[in-house]
Amino acid sequence: MKILVSVRSVEEALLAARGGVDFIDLKEPSGGALGGLPVATIRSIVEALREHGNGVAGKLKTSATIGDVPMTDADRIAACVDAVGACGVDYVKVGIERVSQALAVLDMLARTAWPVVPVFIADRGLDAVHVAHACSLGFPGLMADTADKRAGSLFDAVGAPELKRFVATVRGSGKMVGVAGALRLENCALLSELAPDFAGFRTAVCDGDRTTALDPRRLQALVALMRGGAAMRGGAVVEAG
């Protein structure tokens, strides 16, 4: 399991990079579950990480969200994907709600020129048909996340059996699979049992709620705990919650 941490600025990105995470996810926490950053900010962060020596050409990977765009506005989703992808991130994350438009949006995303990772918003559960359809398309990976971070973690929103089926289905299709959603240090044991390829964190590494600044001590504690569990299980963890 690899570790993903969500950041909103160059300063936070460099802190996370120096802290030893595997993925740096670019988002605006105050803008919702997948709040998007301005394109100029995304580009600045990518350039700063390259200068730091951990850019997209290195081991450290970057992702960025397009923002909470309504699923009914496919044209806007496509335009946002193009704008974010052109900033040089490794992956473009797009939220997938449990709505009737999901299949058509997934088809559209699979035709873009960018490596898109659909993020299934799991507050009302995971739609097996939507997940299976995404697995049949050319995405590099899929994620499960939550929208309402105040309602608890992903494990409060979705039962363990359903999450295990999600991980097994995505992994069985040959894609990487990740989870996020207000994950905290106390969720690490459940993450170890679930064993996704990566887990995403924001809440766990902030000095307060997820909209406050990253706390270097909390980041260090998360990495130490996740690496310890990884060493025993032969894996590592990530957060984007």
Where does each model-flagged region fall?
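Charged helix-capping and loop-helix junction motifs
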Residues: L37-I42, R76-V81, A128-H133, D156-R165, ...
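C-terminal helical cap(s) of enzyme catalytic domains, especially alpha/beta-barrels
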Residues: A40-I45, A102-V105, F201-G241
